[in-house]
Structure formats: structure tokens, C-alpha cells
UniProtKB/Swiss-Prot annotation:
Keywords: DNA-binding, Isopeptide bond, Metal-binding, Nucleus, Repeat, Ubl conjugation, Zinc, Zinc-finger
Entry protein name: Zinc finger protein OZF
One matching Pfam family: zf-C2H2
Organism: Mus musculus
GO molecular function: DNA binding; zinc ion binding
Length: 292
């Protein structure tokens, strides 16, 4: 801080105050930069990738990601970071510190950004909108992953079989096919699952819990994904379009089945006669011919 700035504050002079949040600044230029937060204006652009920021200090920090320089190293595990605040956040993994606590449910987080994102599960806020289909998301990373559906990008590849996925979570789910690991077991019926979320959804079969209710007709569902698909029956939304013929579908799984018409893929083969089918339901129906 300059001597003039110090004198201004110590003398009780007129610092520059933000009209939105009341934060005080010793220079008008600092106030102007701060106000970009509220206006969401991002006048500072990275020359390398074009990413824009509200303050100059953030673009300077960001530019270190292009240089590859990582000056800040963790003394516990040796991992290095290009920015000091990223190191400080990382070190909380080792200390177990979670200073940001949700007032609604008490869950604590390492980063404030994670708390803000979590709080949207209580408020239902989904501020990130897909420009292609209008679907909304609570986090920007969720939107980014979703957008890969529209561009057909599949950057996550299985090392075992080569199957590629648009989202990392789907690759992780898929990999359990190869390992066969199912560590999550239902106390009611003993059925085991490879993922905890799958167990939680399954338990609702026993409890009858249906926490996701349609605002239009009141129908309730055990899974949020089921509610999302159901709502499209009211809105008529069909976000999944076929690149071959243009036909659109309300569910991605339905699009995947439809695509087999164009590719000719028939993964379900009858063990009795060898006839192959593109859909599992057709395969099951066919097998009844042999049992009768």
C-alpha cells in the first residue's frame, strides 16, 4: 500500500465505498475493478486463450497456467501448483480442515466454492444453462460435461476395452463392469452395488420414498433423473437429436437405441439360434419362441 493510501485511511479521509456491498477502497481504480464483480463485466482477457476476468490480478494468475510454471510445492506430498491459493486449498486435504459449513445441514467443505455449489441442493438454484437444449445445472462443471453430448466429444476412454464416454462419471461407472467390485450392500435384501448412489436409489424401493415431485401434475419419483425425463412429457422437450436423420428424443438412452438403426449394431444375440437384435426387449421377446 502506498504512503498516500495509508495516510488517507489513517486520517479518516473519504475512502471509496462500493454502493452494492459497502466494501471500502483507498483508490477509485480499485473500486472500479471491484465493481466488475457485481456487474459481471469481464474486461481483462487472456492473450493465450481468450478467457476473460473481472479483475487484472485474476488474469495475471490465470496466465501462469499457460507457462506451466509451478512454484508452490506441498511439503506433505510434493504436489506443485502455479498459484499459492491453490496450494493452500490443497493442504487442507492433509490437515482435514473444512472451514466452510452449510447452515442448512451442517455439511462442511474445504473450499467456499464447493459450499456455494452444495447450497444449491437446498435452494434448487440452477444458474448454468445449456445454450443448445436449455437444460439447467447447479455447477459450471456439470454444464461443461453435459455440453459434450451435443458436440459428440468423448474424451474419457476405458483402458480395458476402449469404450469412450462424454463424461468421467460414466467411465467410472463402466469400469466396474471389468472389476466386478460391488462394495455397497442393501441391508434389506442383500443386493450389492458398485456405487453408493445406486444403493441409495435402490433403498427407496423398500422405503417407498419418492422425494422428487412434479410441479405440474404432482407425480413423485424416487430418482431426480426420472423426474427430469417425466417433466419433458409436459414441456415436449426433446434435447437429444440424431445427427443422421434429425429425429429427437427426450432421453439419451432412447437416442442410443435409435442410433443402432443407422449403425446396424445388434448386441443381443440368441444363444439358441444365433439371431441378433438391436434392443434387449426384442431379444427377450424372441427367446419365448424357443421356450414354448
Amino acid at each position: 500500500m502506498s504512503q498516500l493510501s495509508q495516510q488517507r485511511i489513517l486520517s479518516g479521509g473519504s475512502p471509496f465505498a462500493c454502493k452494492v456491498c459497502g466494501k471500502l477502497f483507498s483508490h477509485k481504480s480499485n473500486l472500479t475493478e471491484h465493481e466488475h464483480f457485481h456487474s459481471r463485466e469481464k474486461p481483462f482477457e487472456c492473450n493465450e486463450c481468450g478467457k476473460a476476468f473481472s479483475q487484472k490480478q485474476y488474469v495475471i494468475k490465470h496466465q501462469s497456467t499457460h507457462s506451466g510454471e509451478k512454484l508452490f510445492e506441498c511439503s506433505d506430498c510434493g504436489k506443485a501448483f502455479s498459484q499459492k491459493e491453490n496450494l493452500l486449498t490443497h493442504q487442507k486435504i492433509h490437515t482435514g480442515e473444512k472451514p466452510f459449513e452449510c447452515k442448512d445441514c451442517g455439511k462442511a467443505f474445504i473450499q467456499k466454492s464447493n459450499l456455494i455449489r452444495h447450497q444449491r441442493t437446498h435452494t434448487g438454484e440452477k444458474p448454468f444453462i445449456c445454450k443448445e437444449c436449455g437444460k439447467t445445472f447447479s455447477g459450471k462443471s456439470n454444464l461443461t460435461e453435459h455440453e459434450k453430448i451435443h458436440i459428440g466429444e468423448k474424451p474419457f476412454k476405458c483402458n480395458e476395452c476402449g469404450t469412450a464416454f462424454g463424461q468421467k462419471k460414466y467411465l467410472i461407472k463402466h469400469q466396474n463392469i471389468h472389476t466386478g467390485e460391488k462394495p455397497y450392500e442393501c441391508n434389506e435384501c442383500g443386493k450389492a452395488f458398485s456405487q453408493r448412489t445406486s444403493l441409495i436409489v435402490h433403498v427407496r424401493i423398500h422405503s417407498g420414498d419418492k422425494p422428487y415431485e412434479c410441479n405440474v401434475c404432482g407425480k413423485a419419483f424416487s430418482q431426480s433423473s426420472s423426474l427430469t425425463v417425466h417433466v419433458r412429457s409436459h414441456t415436449g422437450e426433446k434435447p437429444y437429436g440424431c445427427n443422421e436423420c434429425g429425429k429427437a428424443f427426450s432421453q439419451f438412452s432412447t437416442l442410443a437405441l435409435h442410433l443402432r438403426i443407422h449403425t446396424g449394431k445388434k448386441p443381443y444375440q440368441c444363444s439358441e439360434c444365433g439371431k441378433a437384435f438391436s434392443q434387449k426387449s426384442h431379444h427377450i421377446r424372441h427367446q419365448k419362441i424357443h421356450t414354448h
